[in-house]
């Protein structure tokens, strides 16, 4: 959901599944970032404080309305209706708060305003409210953007090589195993990433915990701000403790806890599907460069949720190319650069539930083509 006007861009022509799964080119593109930037109207790079706040305030108003309805009217409902009302609240509040998360994420990219202090203040407040350590995310996520598609240096959703698949992997390569893995991924994946860097790149030099200021993820200039992030999380946890003490644990779980689980599940789903697709290459150090890595991502279609999520879902390619660009210009930018990107642009309109299952089935590990000339280019495979 958003406030303010936004140009409407006609959706990409519908592709057949064969076209959707066709590999994107892995050769050095015949265009440069500078040429892409020249094709974009200059106003698309301008950040507006009133406009940025309008989207945030709108999301807060909607979330507050849901909270008011749940606390005021749900206690009056007979039990059969309350069993329907609460799941509706959880789903609606979860997706709206995901939109709030997206705006806070934009602050970490310095795409909210022209003032870094304002971006950091807004991002710290709203990421902390959603139990995300703002500066920890800001710095590790920045490294993800700097190293997207690199098997050695990317920060998250780094695919395994076939040789790294555990012995029990083949026993999970079935419908039941995939169901279990997806359930764990969408319920525990987000906190496990923060606490233990699960799905992140390995750090042999030390324990990679996003809450630990001395973790090898960060450099010396960043460590003090990790303490600030941790303080923000502790402050929110204390507030939740006081709320639970006053209103009851059940109230806190129903009004905040379950919607937060929905937020976490959508964040894992969105990022997983943005970077996992049978058509996308990954590169080792012999082939990787920033532009090809940034193009190793895919735009998806979540229907009406595209707007609720501030188009982070269907403009992700443009976001990786120009991460300081405000989200409310991303549709226009995508339209401007698609003719230049050509086959390097990947859009998949497969319904997200179907795509989630397909990717879990098809994208188990990466390996180079046996007959391919480029041994440093890796593609997804599922044959164990």
Curated annotation (Swiss-Prot):
Q: Where is this region: Disordered?
A: 1-23
Motif: Histidine box-1; annotated at: 105-109
Q: Which residues cross the membrane?
A: 56-76, 84-104, 117-137, 180-200, 226-246, 253-273
- Motif extent (Histidine box-3): 316-320
Tell me its family. Answer: Belongs to the fatty acid desaturase type 1 family.
Role: ER (microsomal) omega-6 fatty acid desaturase introduces the second double bond in the biosynthesis of 18:3 fatty acids, important constituents of plant membranes. It is thought to use cytochrome b5 as an electron donor and to act on fatty acids esterified to phosphatidylcholine and, possibly, other phospholipids.
The identity of this protein, by name, is Omega-6 fatty acid desaturase, endoplasmic reticulum
């Amino acid at each position: 959901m958003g406030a303010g006007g936004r140009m409407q861009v006609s959706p990409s022509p519908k592709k057949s599944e064969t076209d959707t799964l066709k590999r994107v080119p892995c050769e050095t593109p015949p265009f440069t970032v500078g040429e892409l930037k020249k094709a974009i109207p200059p106003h698309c790079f301008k950040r507006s404080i009133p406009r940025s706040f309008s989207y945030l305030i709108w999301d807060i108003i909607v979330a507050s309305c849901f909270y008011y309805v749940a606390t005021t009217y749900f206690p009056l409902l007979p039990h059969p209706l309350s069993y329907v009302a609460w799941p509706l609240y959880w789903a609606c509040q979860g997706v709206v708060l995901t939109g709030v998360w997206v705006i806070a994420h934009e602050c970490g990219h310095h795409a909210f305003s022209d003032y870094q202090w304002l971006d950091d203040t807004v991002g710290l407040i709203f990421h902390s409210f959603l139990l995300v350590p703002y500066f920890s995310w800001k710095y590790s996520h920045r490294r993800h953007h700097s190293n997207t598609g690199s098997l050695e240096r990317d920060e998250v959703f780094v695919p395994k090589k076939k040789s790294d698949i555990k012995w029990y992997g083949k026993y999970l390569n079935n419908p039941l195993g995939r169901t279990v893995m997806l359930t764990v991924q969408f319920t525990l994946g987000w906190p496990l990433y923060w606490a233990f860097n699960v799905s992140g790149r390995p750090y042999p030099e030390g324990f990679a915990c996003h809450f630990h200021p001395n973790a090898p993820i960060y450099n010396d200039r960043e460590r003090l701000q990790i303490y600030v992030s941790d303080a923000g999380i502790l402050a929110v946890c204390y507030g939740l403790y006081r709320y639970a003490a006053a209103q009851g644990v059940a109230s806190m779980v129903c009004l905040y806890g379950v919607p937060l689980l929905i937020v976490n599940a959508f964040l894992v789903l969105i990022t997983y599907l943005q970077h996992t697709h049978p058509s996308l290459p990954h590169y080792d150090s012999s082939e990787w460069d920033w532009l090809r890595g940034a193009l190793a991502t895919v735009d998806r279609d979540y229907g009406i949720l595209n707007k609720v999520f501030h188009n982070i879902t269907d403009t992700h390619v443009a976001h990786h190319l120009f991460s300081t660009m405000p989200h409310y210009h991303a549709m226009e930018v995508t339209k401007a650069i698609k003719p230049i990107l050509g086959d390097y642009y990947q859009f998949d309109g497969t319904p997200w539930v179907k795509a989630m299952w397909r990717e879990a089935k098809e994208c188990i590990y990466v390996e180079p083509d046996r007959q391919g000339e480029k041994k440093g280019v890796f593609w997804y495979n599922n044959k164990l």
